[in-house]
């Protein structure tokens, strides 16, 4: 019989899952930082909308041209970027890189020291670092004869030319691009290997080394060390680690929504009793969900469900690289009309830079209605006013609240950070589903996410396989009660043997 163990690990910067033995699944946890300055109080919706639409031009290339979707930092002032990034350590000795968290792309890439036309400073207030394979004792260049290269060439994610290097060349819809070659080196991370012991771990991974960049990628005000793609491709870090049994094939994030930002990114699963799940639409390059309807203040909007159906040029994508949220025209107009109708008596509707805004003299919580995005599987995503409103630029009469949902210029609806913030999101790739629940993503709250080792059965070969997950504080209470009852049952059964 497997044993049960509750382990509590409280730390502001790191949470992880216990590794109970060979084949166990420790969680890798990365601390997030918010690109928004802490003193920012307003957002130019037009600036964000322009940045997001440039990004969407790149995303849509995956539908028509089969080009791998890599996000760039944006086409506008980074003050309004609204992007989350994390630090990863690569090489020997380990070197730290700031990389953008992006569920809309697949592969981790960082800038090479030999990169041409690459910025040397960043408007994000971070020091830029450059990867030098020659300075890492564990680095190796992926050659054209390598099996990894031959397999990804078949999916147009690699190419071979001179120098026998397995290369890549990504061109984006805004005219920017990056090219380089694949390398293999160590990724370093912290792991819980017992109830309270943190160990330094590492694993060899394949990632991109950018040697040439063009367009907006070359501009210092938008510069960052690279992109951390969390897509479903076999070369994503999540897929690589999961294929070797180092982590489960699942990752989670909790983005803090206020001005100071931050949060947690976990290569593992966070459990919460209020979590709801919706199945991923199969055979899609992005994280597509089946959005079926939208309700405002409990009233279903008059939207034909077919406008959300997934096809070559339609669907609903979850994308952490998009700041706002975009709805297809057939859904956007009814949504705005419903919000206007709900608040017209207590606010002053105004149009600012083409966006519907409202002058409000009191808290928006008691004025604006609750919104429900309803997905397949009976999963509802409940949105508070802060999940669909943003502060606009000051106008005559005050600083308005503006609708952060925008009209998509195509048939694809995209759920960006505006609706993803202040929620735990779980991308369960093994079960092909995404889960979410409201959660306070402040560091002081996140530090009370607990580690639960729920059992250590043995397989036929005698290998210990521990089932592990991160659990929220509220879930821990119910687990303790359940385990206490199981222990009593076990004791009673043994006593009567």
Q: What do these predicted regions represent?
A:
Residues 86-145, 187, 227-231, 304-346, ...:
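Aspartyl protease active-site motif detector
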